[in-house]
């Protein structure tokens, strides 16, 4: 959920909810080793805490990450994690609906929330002296949420309108929705984060409360605080607020989900829509995530995606835009931050009249050439430098740091793995890139989607 709960604080880029999870890859976890190391500890009730010092401005970002997302929903209840995210702003017995948000607004801060396949998060960015108040609010709603039908049902309508805006009225989002459903035949990543419309329409107060009581607890969460703070000085306040919330012993320590069978055949999806102005070709490959990959594979996939898909020097751009002039743009992203098997996505915007078959052949040729022929050392060095530079520049955003650590820890990475990501990128070799391309970028592991304009004449209604 986004704009409805945003309040102004200059310089902060709001997180996306559905389309960020559906259409794009979140930033790879990254931090340079020159930054102060995060401080981590765990409370007696199981709450994990990560404190990231950043003393440049007297501002702090608090994020609470719950280890539950759309992939943890009961079949038939898709969209429930995202629906509950909306409802978490409806107040508690101690703090009526709106008081939390009004307090953030009054101090000149910003708040929002986001839902992903694997996690749900809530954050506030406020002046340093308001952190204790934010802790009290957030700890209270961890188990104190009060829901009534009179505010649950209207919020369901808000979610449905969000679905209309982000998916139903966006042909490219609908294509990605269908690609994901085809890519994951068995795993719940095949369900959209926002849910299927016909299931959203049936979600109830009882559904939301049951999900809340099952998953929202300190031993299923990580608190991330980034900003002008000292870990030892704020720990007593964390103990005073979050430390008083009882744990939920029934929550399993590991997530058990149905896994994908070995892919046996390539799949295709075609979506025709009269509203399409720019056709698209998207290909998604089923690949390991940072938590399921063998040693060295995840950073190699990061570099591979950058090599073939980012910028005007990328191999796909050179082949399809410059050489063959089949496309106006190309892109490739690797979604590494996930609990289970993830994807590497290729996107091509064709030139008018370009043949999809020719574009597919060109994509295949780029991958085949990368596998069979030596990767120039200057290309490898360039893309690794780009990735590491992006990590350095991103440190200007305090909230991006909190997001990197929160997302990484929540899917199962250690703080050291996140912090040392640049070193892992530096260590990637050309042979490793060729190995992961050969192993994972094969047609049988892919779904190719075509977005085309529907030129079928509209049917005229029969008159009696």
Where are the predicted features?
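Non-catalytic beta-strand/loop surface segments
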Residues: 28-70, 96-129, 166-220, 244-291, ...
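N-terminal secretory signal peptides that target proteins for export/translocation
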Residues: 1-8
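Hydrophobic helical h-region of N-terminal Sec-dependent signal peptides
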Residues: 13-19
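Active-site SXXK
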Residues: 78-92
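A common structural junction motif
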Residues: 139-147, 241-249, 364-375
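Short pre-active-site segment immediately N-terminal to the catalytic Zn-binding motif
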Residues: 69-77
């Amino acid at each position: 959920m986004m704009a409805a709960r945003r309040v102004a604080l200059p310089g902060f880029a709001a997180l996306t909810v559905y389309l960020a999870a559906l259409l794009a890859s979140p930033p790879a976890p990254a931090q340079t080793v020159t930054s102060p190391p995060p401080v981590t500890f765990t409370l007696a009730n199981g709450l994990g805490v990560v404190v990231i010092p950043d003393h440049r401005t007297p501002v702090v970002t608090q994020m609470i990450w719950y280890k539950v997302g759309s992939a943890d929903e009961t079949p038939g209840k898709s969209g429930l994690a995202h629906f509950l995210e909306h409802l978490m702003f409806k107040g508690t017995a101690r703090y009526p609906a709106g008081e939390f948000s009004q307090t953030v607004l009054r101090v000149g801060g910003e708040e929002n929330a986001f839902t992903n396949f694997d996690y749900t998060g809530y954050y506030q960015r406020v002046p340093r002296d308001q952190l204790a108040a934010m802790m009290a609010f957030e700890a209270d709603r961890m188990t104190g949420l009060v829901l009534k039908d009179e505010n649950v049902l209207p919020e369901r309508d808000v979610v449905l309108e969000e679905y209309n805006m982000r998916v139903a009225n966006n042909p490219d989002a609908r294509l990605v929705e269908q690609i994901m459903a085809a890519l994951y035949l068995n795993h719940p990543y095949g369900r959209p984060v926002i849910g299927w419309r016909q299931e959203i329409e049936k979600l109830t107060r009882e559904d939301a409360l049951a999900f809340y009581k099952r998953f929202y607890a300190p031993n299923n969460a990580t608190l991330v605080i980034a900003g002008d703070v000292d870990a030892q000085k704020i720990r007593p306040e964390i103990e005073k607020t979050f430390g008083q919330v009882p744990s939920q012993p029934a929550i399993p320590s590991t997530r058990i989900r149905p896994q994908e069978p070995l892919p046996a055949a390539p799949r295709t999806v075609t979506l025709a829509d009269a509203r399409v102005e720019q056709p698209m070709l998207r290909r998604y490959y089923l690949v390991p995530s940072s938590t399921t990959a063998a040693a060295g594979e995840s950073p190699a996939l990061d570099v591979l995606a950058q090599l073939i898909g980012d910028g005007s020097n990328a191999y796909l751009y050179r082949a399809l835009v410059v050489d063959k002039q089949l496309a106006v743009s190309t892109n490739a992203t690797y979604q590494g931050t996930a609990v289970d098997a993830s994807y590497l996505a290729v996107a091509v915007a064709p030139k008018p009249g370009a043949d999809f078959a020719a574009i597919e052949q060109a994509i295949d040729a780029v991958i085949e050439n990368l596998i069979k022929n030596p990767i120039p050392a200057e290309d490898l060095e360039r893309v690794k430098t780009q990735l590491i530079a992006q990590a350095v520049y991103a440190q200007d955003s305090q909230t991006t740091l909190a997001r990197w650590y929160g997302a990484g820890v929540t899917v199962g990475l250690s703080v050291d793995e996140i912090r040392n990501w640049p070193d892992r990128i530096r260590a990637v070799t050309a042979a490793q890139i060729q190995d992961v391309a050969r192993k994972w970028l094969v047609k049988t592991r892919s779904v190719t989607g075509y977005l085309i304009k529907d030129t079928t004449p509209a049917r005229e209604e029969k008159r009696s």
